[in-house]
Regions:
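N-terminal redox-cofactor-binding region of secreted/periplasmic oxidoreductases
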Residues: 1-233
Length: 233
């Protein structure tokens, strides 16, 4: 079969790109993923479904490429977890849904590409999320990825003690770390609700995988891309 678009990798970017492209019913899309795909949420392995998997659970999993990196010539090699499953690294990471500071994006824009300014990116931040805690101009309410923060009465004792020590030292509290004016201590925004990890597979592909113009082919390792000039053939 001939496809209009072939997307390699169903991770943080690929799952989104394929899902968005398939919104055009006149185009056919093939999404290739080296790792497995789990169309049925009920059969999703616990290490991917729930947000508690860490350490050995992830490091030794078949859903992780298990890359090794060496930060310096004399340092011991270290594991660099990267997802090998639909959802990519969003299926195995720490689920911290924290934006950068506006000044950082504006600095990028000042280097030549004005599309990277905070004001230009904000609509996409909002489109990405359904923030269950905030619904102001800086947060989305209809996006595919659900975001929440643990309320203070849900914090474990050590977290409460840390908060008390920080406040007693004179640092301010902030309700929302993703507010552009935020400073001080704040609960971390997470793409995890009720213990469920909202990866791009769950957030994006669950909405698009039944479209007739989108084919998801898992366990498919791409060896190379053949180009003619600047065109992939």
């Amino acid at each position: 079969m001939i496809y209009d678009y072939i997307v390699i990798g169903a991770g943080a970017a690929g799952a989104v790109v394929a899902s968005r492209l398939s919104e055009d019913k006149t185009k056919s899309i093939l999404l290739l993923e080296a790792g497995p795909d789990y169309p049925d949420f009920e059969r999703l392995p616990d290490e991917l479904k729930f947000g508690y998997a860490s350490g050995t659970d992830v490091m030794t999993s078949d859903h992780n490429w298990q890359f090794l990196g060496q930060p310096t010539p004399i340092a011991e090699p270290m594991l660099v977890p990267r997802g090998r499953v639909t959802g990519g690294s969003t299926a195995i990471n720490g689920q911290i849904f924290l934006r950068g500071m506006p000044e950082d994006y504006d600095t990028w824009a000042s280097l030549g590409n004005t599309e990277w300014s905070f004001d230009k990116l904000l609509p996409y931040f909002r489109k990405l999320e359904t923030d269950l805690d905030f619904s102001d101009d800086f947060h989305g309410t209809e996006g595919p990825i659900q975001v929440r923060r643990y309320k203070e009465d849900e914090w474990v004792p050590i977290t409460k003690a840390f908060k008390e020590s920080v406040v007693s030292a004179g640092y301010p509290m902030s309700e929302d770390a993703n507010n552009p004016d935020a400073t001080g201590l704040s609960a971390t925004p997470l793409n995890n609700t009720k213990g469920i990890r909202w990866s791009t597979s769950l957030g994006y592909l669950s909405e698009s995988r039944d479209r007739l113009n989108l084919t998801i082919k898992a366990d498919s390792v791409v060896q190379k891309i053949i180009f003619e000039g600047k065109k992939a053939v």
